[in-house]
Curated annotation (Swiss-Prot):
Could be a nuclease involved in processing of the 5'-end of pre-16S rRNA. NCBIfam families: RNAse_H_YqgF (TIGR00250). Its main location: cytoplasm. It is found in: Cytoplasm. Keywords: Cytoplasm, Hydrolase, Nuclease, Ribosome biogenesis. It is an enzyme of class 3 (hydrolase). GO terms for molecular function: nuclease activity. InterPro entries: RNaseH-like_sf (IPR012337), YqgF (IPR005227), YqgF/RNaseH-like_dom (IPR006641), YqgF/RNaseH-like_dom_sf (IPR037027). Coiled coil: none annotated. It comes from Ehrlichia ruminantium (strain Welgevonden). This is Putative pre-16S rRNA nuclease. CDD domains: YqgF.
């Protein structure tokens, strides 16, 4: 099922499984996973997109291989919180993933995540060329960590 409300998503998370996060882009998708306690986001990989069918299968494979039970996908709203063409593609992708694999997906506002990822890499003295290779998975980590922190607050 598709969730846009963190309270509702928190109630359906399988606490015995990890959470996977995607930073969705036109050419690449950053992937991050929670640790087994669902407290810490860990970078996984940058997946280079092929076509929707292959992308769905490959990303679901990562979910299964890493014992994840639900997914967070960054929703790239504009600066005013409005949807755009990429948001439509993200929602279409999420709905196809749900239809094919029956998993719970939470769409999280990811405004500024790529900019923050670039800034983190710069602060770590990573050269721009190298940073471009990892920005997507850093962005996925930042998105997932925000969600994990929100879930932790709601569980208190």
């Amino acid at each position: 099922m598709l969730y846009k409300n963190i309270n509702e998503f928190e109630q359906v998370i399988d606490k015995t499984k990890r959470i996977m996060c995607l930073d969705f882009g036109e050419k690449k998708i950053g992937v991050a996973l929670s640790d087994k306690t669902n407290l810490i986001a860990i970078p996984h990989s940058v997946y280079v997109r092929k076509n929707t069918r292959k992308d769905l299968g490959s990303l679901y494979g990562i979910l299964i291989e890493n014992d994840a039970g639900s997914m967070v996908i960054g929703l790239p709203l504009d600066l005013f919180g409005m949807g755009n063409e990429l948001c439509d593609k993200v929602m279409l992708f999420a709905n196809r993933m749900i239809k094919k694999y029956a998993i719970n997906i939470y769409l999280h506002d990811e405004r500024y995540s790529t900019a923050m990822a670039t800034r983190v890499a710069k602060l770590a003295n990573i050269k721009r060329k190298e940073s471009q290779k990892i920005d997507d998975k850093i962005a996925a980590v930042l998105i997932l960590q925000q969600v994990l922190d929100m879930v932790k607050i709601y569980q208190m």
